Amino acid sequence: MPKRVDINKILVIGSGPIIIGQAAEFDYAGTQACLALKEEGYEVILVNSNPATIMTDTEMADRVYIEPLTPEFLTRIIRKERPDAILPTLGGQTGLNLAVELSERGVLAECGVEVLGTKLSAIQQAEDRDLFRTLMNELNEPVPESEIIHSLEEAEKFVSQIGFPVIVRPAYTLGGTGGGICSNETELKEIVENGLKLSPVHQCLLEKSIAGYKEIEYEVMRDSQDHAIVVCNMENIDPVGIHTGDSIVVAPSQTLSDREYQLLRNVSLKLIRALGIEGGCNVQLALDPDSFQYYIIEVNPRVSRSSALASKATGYPIAKLAAKIAVGLSLDEMMNPVTGKTYAAFEPALDYVVSKIPRWPFDKFESANRKLGTQMKATGEVMAIGRTLEESLLKAVRSLEADVYHLELKDAADISDELLEKRIKKAGDERLFYLAEAYRRGYTVEDLHEFSAIDVFFLHKLFGIVQFEKELKANAGDTDVLRRAKELGFSDQYISREWKMKESELYSLRKQAGIAPVFKMVDTCAAEFESETPYFYSTYEEENESVVTDKKSVMVLGSGPIRIGQGVEFDYATVHSVWAIKQAGYEAIIVNNNPETVSTDFSISDKLYFEPLTIEDVMHIIDLEQPMGVVVQFGGQTAINLADELSARGVKILGTSLEDLDRAEDRDKFEQALGELGVPQPLGKTATSVNQAVSIASDIGYPVLVRPSYVLGGRAMEIVYHEEELLHYMKNAVKINPQHPVLIDRYLTGKEIEVDAVSDGETVVIPGIMEHIERAGVHSGDSIAVYPPQSLTEDIKKKIEQYTIALAKGLNIVGLLNIQFVLSQGEVYVLEVNPRSSRTVPFLSKITGIPMANLATKIILGQKLAAFGYTEGLQPEQQGVFVKAPVFSFAKLRRVDITLGPEMKSTGEVMGKDSTLEKALYKALIASGIQIPNYGSVLLTVADKDKEEGLAIAKRFHAIGYNILATEGTAGYLKEASIPAKVVGKIGQDGPNLLDVIRNGEAQFVINTLTKGKQPARDGFRIRRESVENGVACLTSLDTAEAILRVLESMTFRADQMPAVNTNQEAAVTI
């Protein structure tokens, strides 16, 4: 059926900020969809609150609204734009939930807006647990025995009939939020209450647990003509019971017989037809390992994390084709862009194995509960491609950048057998490594199958890897053994360690023996047809399929998996850099391993290599391609950390030189440079031993800021208030030695200011200055940032401009530069300089219209800023106020303290823009998920050091009509200042205490600041966690509270500004 001509204007809903369960895969899907619709000639209107994405770039749609994703804001945009249709299936759960709500409120009908792609009734049938179960029963398709419940009593009644264990699945939530497996009454109470709270329709499905079954997924496409195909089928190595986003997944499935494969394939196609889904859809099934009994777990009627993985695993662009299906095109009318010869109706075929391993944030959150279940905890994922499962899996392991390069964990050998068994039985994020350790201790495949319920096929493969380790150790220097090790996916780093030689020596040995990988093409058709895509992976075979052209090429290193501290902002910069390289007339080559992102879409670069970002894997590509240089500025710390090794092997690093990168990152050299340039910095020194650290800290004076050198996202950074805490930090957070020194700085309290700049060595362009709302000490990625600055004098701005220019020139920066300053007692100090792209680059680029990553790339390639018409210094400020606010995923991570500090904790960001600071703040806070009711109660629990400031805040809350709740001591202190406060019991006291108030929804805001030092924080920790579990905004910085107050004050009439009219009777005029 040809595309529709009765519609012209289409509104696309984005997925908003990156949170656990909804990451960069929707930026990729949304970007593909917008471009596909524009390609077909439609006018595209995009709404998304996330400034860090490619999707919100002006080139992606005809009009882009970076506004909060709430029904209220969308209603205004729909009334203003009057689109003919809306496409909600590319914005994740957020997009679906909004479409359903806009329909229920009657907005779509009022404005005559049609829903494209999958119909709302189908979305509701797939998402509403009750409707879905009813449909499955009508189709005679098996679902686990289950019950829809709306209260704890209903849950207890159901369990008394079928017994434990049961799985709880809340309706309309994302990434399994609020769900879990319950094995007893206590767990049932906790999980059901939480699940009902988090479900927007207060409904949960309780089902008999089928944990231990194989979990199989089918990614299916269907068009309006009822053509339906399977794009990819995938198998979770972890059995049912662990969220698929937290499972290690392989494609194609490895353990299904043809009969099983066809059985589940037919079921998946039957379901997509029964639901009437038009576009992409993900079907999750459970299969009994010992029979043909299967159950349907769920259907996602939208583009999902799995479809991004399936797209990258097969090369088949699901989101692009789903968008075209939505406007009426059918699969047999569209060409498959990979081959350019076959139609999209051909099912892809794979002649390789793909492995996906999730990337969890537990390196950031040491205290988090690492146990995996039905609620997702990973922030991102990596994918690797190999000819065998072993090769693909080992490549994925070293892509994780989790300090592992083989199936080995540093301290796994030290734990007892008992603990090892426990960690295999109760799945955690490191189970794969513990399985390998168990084999080294003599456990058998049967033992481990019994402990983990993982299929014996996968366990045999792992056993084979561990067995080969012995052969490798026994045959040092044997090139036949070396070749087999490389075919299995063993890394040079591991082999060189076992053979007691340098990695570079092993590399030379391999070269002499002719043991080098070849590159194979991902072509969707197992080499049956010729293919046009330049999408490659390495493997140790004979024939190389990657043809090197005569054109000069430039290689860009991507940023790997999404994790806290290194998010989608770096992918944004990578993509812009690739576009700039192509514009400059060079061939752009990208190396990356993240299946969720735009940068790994094969249509972005001239050549895409899907490989681990390690020195070995990158060098293989360089050996073949011989690029004129490598760009490391845009891939975050991942790429910067490779610069040294690459340079040592004779590779040219483009942009800022290695010596100058080192001057910015190495503490002593940096201090020296600042001294020469006359730029002040806080008093600080470098310690290489614990004793030295203690004496430095006492010389400088507490509190001090301590951090390891060369890190991103403030990893292991802390503010320390006395010696005892310093010793605890030294012992637990860092491994201090002369190679890994620790930096100790005087902790300055003051306003933090951030600047991004582009320099070509002669001219320095500063697009803008951003002022942070939270004072120094809160990581810049977790602060609310405002542009243009609202409280800085012209003198201070001038000084920041001078220092930035001096630093850029003094450090010989070529390309991008990010500087953080602190304004303390009228003086500007430099906190740190990052000679690379930063997480504020997309935000500033969008506001100022200065395409920073694109410009920086052209500078790196030898052009000058003056040629583009830029003059030196701070550029004129834009009209309006722009606010960037962080977004956290604390609800998904139990036992994590939400207090803001120098270590980054946010997973994403949103932007609010308007004519005044208050309005822009309001939009940013609403977009980040904070409710701002203009009446209610605020619960105040502040540390003694914050009492005075807390008092001022309480006064202002009281003035706008808020009730103040506080514990006895604080309430007394407030009463002395004539502020009425209701007394609430401390934790553990009888009567309504702090936790009861939060649980019962009696407080709209909780303001809680840490007591000095970390230890007495346990009560504070419980208050903060209780707030998160109950969805109450908890503010751990008084600056954030002040910002919310500004918004509330601008929205409400203050009581003291509404005096009653004087009714003095005597003066009344008598008639």
From Swiss-Prot:
GO terms for cellular component: cytoplasm. Pfam families: CPSase_L_D2, CPSase_L_D3, MGS. It comes from the Bacteria. Mg(2+) 4 binds at E832, N834. Mn(2+) 3 binds at Q820, E832. Its cofactor is Mg(2+); Mn(2+). Mg(2+) 1 binds at Q284, E298. It is an enzyme of class 6 (ligase). ATP 2 binds at R707, R746, L748, E752, G777, V778, H779, S780, Q820, E832. Transmembrane segments: none annotated. Pathway: Amino-acid biosynthesis; L-arginine biosynthesis; carbamoyl phosphate from bicarbonate: step 1/1; Pyrimidine metabolism; UMP biosynthesis via de novo pathway; (S)-dihydroorotate from bicarbonate: step 1/3. The keyword Repeat applies. Residues 402-546 are annotated as: Oligomerization domain. GO terms for biological process: 'de novo' UMP biosynthetic process; glutamine metabolic process; L-arginine biosynthetic process. Its EC number is 6.3.4.16, 6.3.5.5. SMART domains: CPSase_L_D3 (SM01096), GARS_A (SM01209), MGS (SM00851). Mg(2+) 3 binds at Q820, E832. Residues 930-1071 are annotated as: Allosteric domain. Mn(2+) 2 binds at E298, N300. ATP 1 binds at R129, R169, G175, G176, K208, I210, E215, G241, I242, H243, Q284, E298. Small subunit of the glutamine-dependent carbamoyl phosphate synthetase (CPSase). CPSase catalyzes the formation of carbamoyl phosphate from the ammonia moiety of glutamine, carbonate, and phosphate donated by ATP, constituting the first step of the biosynthetic pathway leading to pyrimidine nucleotides. The large subunit is composed of 2 ATP-grasp domains that are involved in binding the 2 ATP molecules needed for carbamoyl phosphate synthesis. The N-terminal ATP-grasp domain (referred to as the carboxyphosphate synthetic component) catalyzes the ATP-dependent phosphorylation of hydrogencarbonate to carboxyphosphate and the subsequent nucleophilic attack by ammonia to form a carbamate intermediate. Belongs to the CarB family. This is Carbamoyl phosphate synthase pyrimidine-specific large chain. The lineage of its organism: Bacteria, Bacillati, Bacillota, Bacilli, Bacillales.
